[in-house]
Amino acid sequence: MCIRDSYTPEEVERLRGSIKIEYSMCKMQSQKLWRLLNTESYVNTLGSLSGNHAVQHAKAGLKAIYLSGWQVAADANSAGEMYPDQSLYPYDSAPKLVETMNNSLIRADQIQHMEMIDGDMDKSKRTDYMLPIIADGEAGFGGPLNVFELTKKFIRAGAAGVHFEDQLASEKKCGHMGGKVLVPTGTMIKNLKAARLAADI
């Protein structure tokens, strides 16, 4: 069964509301990521935890950025605390960081664009600053409703892709640690369907 099969087009349209909202950054970046994944043998990326890091990744020639949950937990969460990789930080921290990184990338692109128009920069030395960001959604910070809301926040922030772990959110541990508690397969499928619905709406 395909994840999309849970909701009919009519149900999605009904939930969408009368105002069609376009998230151009997310759409552009997800299409770019899809092209990369289908044309490159691999897509090398590094973890980034600030807007400046994202700009430096672009200048270094990377084609995508990874936003790791452990980095958000350790150093880049909205609580300003240092946490272990156990999803203890505020759930909106990673989407806020995606937005910050995209704002920095957009600004770097604007500066470069002005410099090229003004003749201060050779167009052949152009840097592609608009790198797709792949975000770690941890274990979703709860059940399907939480995954739905978190996915909406990532889309609004312009994430190109999000992945979710199949761990029980309330017992989440760092991926390389023992003693992890996994959710039943049916629960994980519900989480993925909720994320897909958020993207469709």
What residues fall within each predicted segment?
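Glycine-rich anion/phosphate-binding loops
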Residues: 38, 42-55, 59, 89-97, ...
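Glycine-rich tight-turn/loop motif centered on a GG-T
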Residues: 70-98, 144-145, 151-152, 167-190
